[in-house]
Amino acid sequence: MERIIQQTDYDALSCKLAAISVGYLPSSGLQRLSVDLSKKYTEWHRSYLITLKKFSRRAFGKVDKAMRSSFPVMNYGTYLRTVGIDAAILEFLVANEKVQVVNLGCGSDLRMLPLLQMFPHLAYVDIDYNESVELKNSILRESEILRISLGLSKEDTAKSPFLIDQGRYKLAACDLNDITETTRLLDVCTKREIPTIVISECLLCYMHNNESQLLINTIMSKFSHGLWISYDPIGGSQPNDRFGAIMQSNLKESRNLEMPTLMTYNSKEKYASRWSAAPNVIVNDMWEIFNAQIPESERKRLRSLQFLDELEELKVMQTHYILMKAQW
């Protein structure tokens, strides 16, 4: 199952690279990137892909092929997912001088690179299955631009449970379904009193209900002040809504993969109810975010990149993905 779920990270990586190659990302305004960081953002992601080829030609081939065949509607989705999460992170970082980020199920995500350069008091922890972080560790150390940006040595010198333990950045292996292992790891790499951002980006949808709820409850009780940012698909709650059923069928047929809670938390309200212990919970679908949070000047920029004639398809897709922010 770990290996199957890791394949979904390659999907996310190919989508991110496709959006970058066409110019959807980076969004220097919404991601608050300087000219220099915008240039580095592109270089970091391209270097990650090139270096991936050294360790897995098969994975590189899949990512490269998918990247080149991405449609505008997919690029819009990746753009919204990325800037939506980044905007939530940035809002919390600006409001709190010292912050730690815990990225659950980090995969190949490189969000830590610009954030660590932008915020000198930020600490960042990436956590995922062993196989995923082993590959990420190898790529980060092998690529010169990635290695230098994180201040790493080419040799792996970190001590268990970390693969990377370098200043303000840590990379660690953990099965997040095992709450004992997860708690033990957080005990050694985070501090309770520091304001904490928890990111779960397409993670909880692959976990069973009991395990995911225990993870949420345990982590929220562990930190005195925090912001949980979660991005996931929802199955849809309208009588004639077939989105969730079709998604489940496609995943089962193509990957033998399940999303156990896709239909359990099939609406924004049901999804957000998992964070009922938090006093401040905001949940939006990505279509709402597109219409309410993306300024017209930015939408004009997006329209100049590619012609999008599947506006109704974009609406259907993005109303079935949500961004939830729970603050306590």
Swiss-Prot record:
This is Leucine carboxyl methyltransferase 1. It comes from the Eukaryota. Disulfide bonds: none annotated. InterPro entries: LCMT1 (IPR016651), Ppm1/Ppm2/Tcmp (IPR007213), SAM-dependent_MTases_sf (IPR029063). Belongs to the methyltransferase superfamily. LCMT family. Its EC number is 2.1.1.233. The keyword Transferase applies. The lineage of its organism: Eukaryota, Fungi, Dikarya, Ascomycota, Saccharomycotina. It catalyses: [phosphatase 2A protein]-C-terminal L-leucine + S-adenosyl-L-methionine = [phosphatase 2A protein]-C-terminal L-leucine methyl ester + S-adenosyl-L-homocysteine. Keywords: Methyltransferase, S-adenosyl-L-methionine, Transferase. S-adenosyl-L-methionine binds at R81, G105, D128, D175, L176, N177, E201. GO terms for molecular function: protein C-terminal leucine carboxyl O-methyltransferase activity. It is an enzyme of class 2 (transferase). Methylates the carboxyl group of the C-terminal leucine residue of protein phosphatase 2A catalytic subunits to form alpha-leucine ester residues. Acts on the two major protein phosphatase 2A catalytic subunits, PPH21 and PPH22. The keyword Iron does not apply. Inhibited by S-adenosyl-L-homocysteine.
